[in-house]
Design a protein with these regions (language model features):
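Cytosolic catalytic domains that perform sulfur/thiol-centered chemistry
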Residues: 1-267
Length: 267
């Protein structure tokens, strides 16, 4: 959603739309207190990392995520808008999380709070309260990859079975910067820094994004990963904007992969 469209909805209190709109600020609470979009609630999604994609780990992730989303007060048929400072990773993570639970009435605010503020739109400092609901979204495994699935991909003799995209920085990818248990990247991964998705804080237009991902056929499975599944969620969204149908986020990402000694790294 554009900042202009959201501002119009809030400014004119469009009947039947603003009442069914939930705006979620995914920045740190300290930033939220300094000013935020009117009526938005705060959920610092960077605090909700999950690095265990074993069968038990995914079951726990599902349980904890439903609890988290219930605290947001998400109701059926309600439009949810996530935002951060730009069109960044935490807002994209919120969108991906709802899609994982088959909730389709979701978007991010393109440009984020920095562009909202830059345009001079209204800002408030009051802390808006959560309204609890019982969220019971149905899991959509088509958007989440596990370490087991990644291992099957890299073990396949057919390189075309799926494409793996590393959304981290180049220095993380080549092992110059070490975050996690080991340095390097997942074998067979292609490196495209998530920041290539943006220009001046907004998502690039279709043609510009298409050039970034021109090496990846739309009929193949794409799996994005980063350190903890946030930058990868931004890549997930970019690919969805381009019309890719089979896109997943490796939830555990490098944080999990590098900690499991039985899984091979590459440099």
């Amino acid at each position: 959603m554009s900042i202009q469209n959201l501002n119009s909805l809030l400014s004119h209190n469009v009947k039947g739309q603003t009442e069914n709109l939930l705006i979620v600020d995914t920045r740190p609470f300290s930033d939220y207190l300094k000013g935020h979009i009117p009526s938005s609630i705060n959920l610092d999604l960077m605090q909700f990392h999950w690095l265990d994609t074993s069968i038990t780990g995914i079951k726990q992730f599902n349980r904890q995520s439903r609890f988290l989303l219930s605290n947001l007060g998400i109701q059926n048929k309600e439009k949810v808008i996530f935002y951060d400072d730009t069109s960044g990773p935490t807002a994209a993570r919120g969108l991906w999380l709802l899609l994982y639970f088959s909730y389709k009435e979701v978007a991010i605010l393109d440009g984020g709070f920095s562009k909202w503020k830059e345009k001079g739109f209204k800002i408030e400092k009051v802390t808006n309260q959560f309204q609890y609901s019982r969220f019971q979204g149905k899991v959509n495994s088509d958007v989440l990859a596990t370490s087991k699935e990644i291992n099957l991909v890299i073990g396949s003799k057919k390189n075309s079975k799926a494409y793996i995209i590393d959304s981290r920085s180049e220095k993380e990818f080549d092992g110059t910067v070490v975050r996690g248990g080991r340095r390097g990247h997942i074998p067979k991964a292609h490196h495209i820094d998530w920041s290539m998705n943006l220009a001046n804080g907004y998502f690039k237009n279709y043609n510009e994004l298409a050039r970034v991902y021109s090496d990846f056929p739309k009929d193949k499975q794409i799996i994005a990963y980063c350190q903890g599944g946030y930058r990868a969620a931004n890549t997930f969204l970019a690919l969805k904007l381009l019309g890719y149908k089979k896109v997943k986020v490796y939830l555990g990402s490098w944080g999990e992969w590098s900690s499991l000694q039985n899984l091979p790294p590459e440099r």
